[in-house]
């Protein structure tokens, strides 16, 4: 079963939310404030901690009557097991909710948007730079990496003045592996070699080497046309006339210049080419900016892809050489979907896909002190819960409520916990460090959950350290696994 918000989901009419006793007040408050466009009910099962549920246990303990009218059941996001087990028993769609109930409003907003999200019409060409200087193994590894990152075409970048006798074999190997291949060179012999081996795109031709394109007639190979060196857009005309006469498909690249070397003027050239040639295919080398701008590449790629989407530039060339551009191909893949959605839906590129928000968070979800005090009143076990907000860290259990705004000194917080078990101390130290980082960067913290780094976010811990520690501390497995017992997760 697809999680709520997945592409192709159906808008529900009535939703049944399943939760535990501790989370019930917060869940009801979130739903009340959300005022969702569907009817809903909340079912509180016989368990304190919702995160300790499994789908098998829910299937045994949940009671859904046909008269309830629910067409969607939302179970806790941290619940383990296959939701299909519940769906098969009750004949209703069952999906996991967000791991943090505070994300429910945004979660359902995304579900609606996701039904229209994911399409793209910008092709990504990923360049392997200085290919002649790399081993065959390194070239294949780079190509595999770029393809897995979302590249549509693998560009073999030749080096001017350096012989590349293996070019044909490299192109053939990549094509045999199911990849589409282009070659980046002005050298006519290298162009002929690569095309003979199966390359489908040539970067680039201008007045200096356009005659080689005559040899490509009938192959279906596309060429990228750039202005003559030092020339204006007017120098494109002669090359375009020849390519049209020879029936060679082409893309126009007016050349994106780095900041400090005419960046703004180069953007204007792209707009001018679109005005002069409204039907022409175009390419933009966005790597010229990401590689030469000391800034995280996520935002740079987002803006450049947005420009391409609005101008109808249907191909981009990028690479990942400098460290701050690592992940640029994946970023372009996310950006082309986001910007396609924004432009075609005539909306802002927000609220549907936050994977390009990496260092900061789209929203910082917190609890107030009153909410945490109310939560503490319902806790009966000594296991510590850790919370973070914009100003500090709170740690609480059934007896202690510790609050600190000095997040750079988590040792002071730890000293007040009275923990002497090494494993428990390690666990709490890890969580406090993560909470401190969240406060420092302005991110949402969720105990035992990975901080959000956008498309770079690692998976959450697969096994709850806190549950495991609870089991050991109490000397019995029942404490953490018997749903009738109080647990350790809120």
Residue ranges and their predicted role:
Residues 16-20, 30-37, 219-357:
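Catalytic alpha/beta core domains of metabolic enzymes, predominantly
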Residues 120-141, 228-232, 289-298:
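Active-site mouth loops of central-metabolism enzymes
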Residues 53-56, 78-85, 104-106, 160-172, ...:
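Active-site-adjacent beta->alpha loops and helix N-cap segments on the catalytic face
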Residues 1-117, 123, 342, 353-490:
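Long, compositionally biased, glycine/small-hydrophobic-enriched stretches that function as flexible linkers
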Residues 94-99, 154-160, 179-187, 199-213, ...:
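Catalytic beta/alpha-barrel core
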Residues 73, 150, 184, 252, ...:
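Conserved, mostly hydrophobic/aromatic
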Residues 54, 133-146, 186-187, 191, ...:
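Short, acidic/polar
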Residues 91, 161-193, 216-225, 270-284, ...:
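Alpha-helix-loop-beta-strand connector modules within alpha/beta enzyme cores
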């Amino acid at each position: 079963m697809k999680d709520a918000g997945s592409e192709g989901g159906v808008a529900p009419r009535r939703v049944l939310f399943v939760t535990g006793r501790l989370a019930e007040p917060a869940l009801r408050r979130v739903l009340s404030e959300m005022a969702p466009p569907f009817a809903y009910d909340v079912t509180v099962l016989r368990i304190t901690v919702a995160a300790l549920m499994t789908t098998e246990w829910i299937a045994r303990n949940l009671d859904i009557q046909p008269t309830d009218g629910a067409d969607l059941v939302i179970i806790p996001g941290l619940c383990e097991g296959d939701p299909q087990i519940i769906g098969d028993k009750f004949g209703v769609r069952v999906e996991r909710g967000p791991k943090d109930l505070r994300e429910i409003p945004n979660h359902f907003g995304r579900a609606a948007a996701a039904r229209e999200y994911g399409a793209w019409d910008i092709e990504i060409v990923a360049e392997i730079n200085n290919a002649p200087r790399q081993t065959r193994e390194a070239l294949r590894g780079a190509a595999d990496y770029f393809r897995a990152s979302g590249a549509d075409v693998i560009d073999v970048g030749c080096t001017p003045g350096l012989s590349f006798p293996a070019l044909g074999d490299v192109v053939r190997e990549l094509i045999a592996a199911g990849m589409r291949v282009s070659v980046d060179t002005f050298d006519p012999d290298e162009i002929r070699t690569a095309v003979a081996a199966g390359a489908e795109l040539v970067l680039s031709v201008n007045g200096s080497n356009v005659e080689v394109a005559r040899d490509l007639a009938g192959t279906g190979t596309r060429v990228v046309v750039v202005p003559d060196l030092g020339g204006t857009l007017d120098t494109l005309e002669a090359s375009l006339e020849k390519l049209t006469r020879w029936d060679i498909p082409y893309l126009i690249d007016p050349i994106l210049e780095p900041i400090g070397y005419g960046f703004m003027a180069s953007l204007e050239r792209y707009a001018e080419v679109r005005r002069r040639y409204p039907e022409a295919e175009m390419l933009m080398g966005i790597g010229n900016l990401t590689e030469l701008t000391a800034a995280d590449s996520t935002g740079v790629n987002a803006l450049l892809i947005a420009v391409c989407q609005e101008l109808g530039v249907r191909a981009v060339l990028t690479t990942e050489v400098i460290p701050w551009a690592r992940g640029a191909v994946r970023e372009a893949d996310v950006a082309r979907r986001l910007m396609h959605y924004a432009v075609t839906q005539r909306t802002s590129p927000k609220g549907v896909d936050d994977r390009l928000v990496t260092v900061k968070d789209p929203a910082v979800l917190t609890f107030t002190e009153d909410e945490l005090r109310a939560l503490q009143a319902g806790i009966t076990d000594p296991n510590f819960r850790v919370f973070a907000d914009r100003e500090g860290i709170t740690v609480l259990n059934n007896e202690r409520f510790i609050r600190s705004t000095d997040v750079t000194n988590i040792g002071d917080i730890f000293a007040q916990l009275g923990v002497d078990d090494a494993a428990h101390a390690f666990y709490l130290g890890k969580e406090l460090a993560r909470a401190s980082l969240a406060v420092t960067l302005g991110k949402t913290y969720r105990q035992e959950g990975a901080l959000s780094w956008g498309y770079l976010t690692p998976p959450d811990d697969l096994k709850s350290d806190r549950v495991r520690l609870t089991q050991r501390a109490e000397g019995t497995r029942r404490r953490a696994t018997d749903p009738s017992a109080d647990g350790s997760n809120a």
